[in-house]
Structures are given as structure tokens and as C-alpha cells.
Amino acid sequence: MKNKVVLLLFIVCSAWTATAQTVADSLALVAAHWQVTSLKKGVLCRKAFFNSLYGVPQEVSVLEITPKYYNLDVLIHQPKEETSVAAHRSGAIAAVNGSYFNMKAGNSVCYLRKNGVVVDTTANGALGTVSNGAVFIKKGRMKLLPWSKQEEKACRLKHGTVLVSGPLMLMNGKECDISACNQSFVNTKHPRSAIVLTKDKKILFVVVDGRMKGKAEGVNIPELTHMIRVLGGKD
């Protein structure tokens, strides 16, 4: 029986300032002193601190998963439940925040369909414009897909899980068009998390911390796109 890795449904973002990625940022990521911990067979956790990455201090964590050893799933949990607590309760060996939610009501504001049942739909507004990608999981295997309101209306999948989020940054190694996304959300620094498929068929859970002035100030979407490309991302 394979162990389980879950994508937790909820994520909260907070704003900071924007800056462009540079060659120096690429070199900083490549030359970083990553603290590497082996959690289990096929699961490595890497963590690094940067005095200046994309113009500000950063704290970056990367979980590298060899998918043949693990099944992935989406866990729906209460907004006030800590990620680590929800992961432990579900029996997962690792977890990452996976999409956006309404802080008052607690429900997802992005489309979520699990085994033919629509749990939530994508809300209108800024988050609706950036929710142009989806995680599709079936029998523990994961794909990343482009998504739109048209796909959402037409979706009739009876098996597996679809969780919409975004913006989708890379497909087949090429940057995606994010011109239709809310530009304030795209260009403002936030704490961010990303799911990445690499060229060597690994899965990365990338977390960039924020909300900590002078220690970890977050990234915007172009910066996050640059980061996952340097880390070997394909999708």
C-alpha cells in the first residue's frame, strides 16, 4: 500500500511590493545553501534563507516527491485547522496549501469536484481571473491542466478530483499567458505556494513564506515563475 501525500484546500495571501527577477536571482537560487532533510524514501525537504532574492529577504521550502512511491489526494479541511494537524489526521506524510477560500464562510472560492460531486464553484472577482489552472488527481496520479469557466461548465468527470487554482505559470516548459489575470494580484508580492512537475518527473511542493518584514517578504507571479523554472519545473 502506497503512502499518501495531500494538497490541502485552503491558502491565504498577503500583499507586499513587486520587483523583477534577474540573473543574480538565478545564481542565488542555484548557489543557495539548501538545508536538505530526507523524510522518507522518495521525499526530500529543502529549505533555504536568502538575504536578498527578488530584492528582499526570502525563506523558501521545497518538498521533492518521487511519485512512484506515493499517492496524491485533495483533503478538504476546516479553515482554522492547521495544515500540519490536518495532514497528520489524514495519515499524509506531507501536505501543502492548495487553493483559495472565503475567510468568513470557510468554503473554497475555486472549483472543486470530487468523484463526480461538485463541492464548490469558482467565484467571480480577482481570484476568479487568476484561477486558470487545475490539479487533476485520479488513482493517486496527478496532472496539471489549463482551466476556464467553459471547462468548468462542461466538466462531467465521475471519477477523480479536480481542484482549480492559479494562475497557471508553466506548461511544457513554456510560460503561460497571464494577461487576463488580475494584475494587482499577479504583480504584488504575496506568500505563495506552487505545485510543480519537473523535467525529470518529480513533483515539487514549493512554499515561499511572507508577512515577515526583513525576513521573508514573498514573491509575485513572474518571480515565482522564474523560481520554479530554475528549480527544474516543466508544468
Residue ranges of predicted features:
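Hydrophobic N-terminal alpha-helices or hydrophobic patches in metabolic proteins across all domains
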Residues: 94, 232-234
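Residues that act as N-cap/strand-start positions at coil-to-secondary-structure junctions
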Residues: 57, 129, 163, 189-191
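Short, solvent-exposed aromatic-acidic interface loops
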Residues: 76-82, 149-154, 208-213
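Bacterial Sec-dependent N-terminal signal peptides
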Residues: 1-26
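A substrate-binding/cap region within the structured catalytic cores of diverse enzymes
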Residues: 129-182
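Solvent-exposed loop/turn segments at secondary-structure junctions
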Residues: 69-70, 100-103, 151, 201, ...
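Domain-core and long-helix interface of multi-subunit machines
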Residues: 171-232
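Zymogen propeptides
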Residues: 21-144
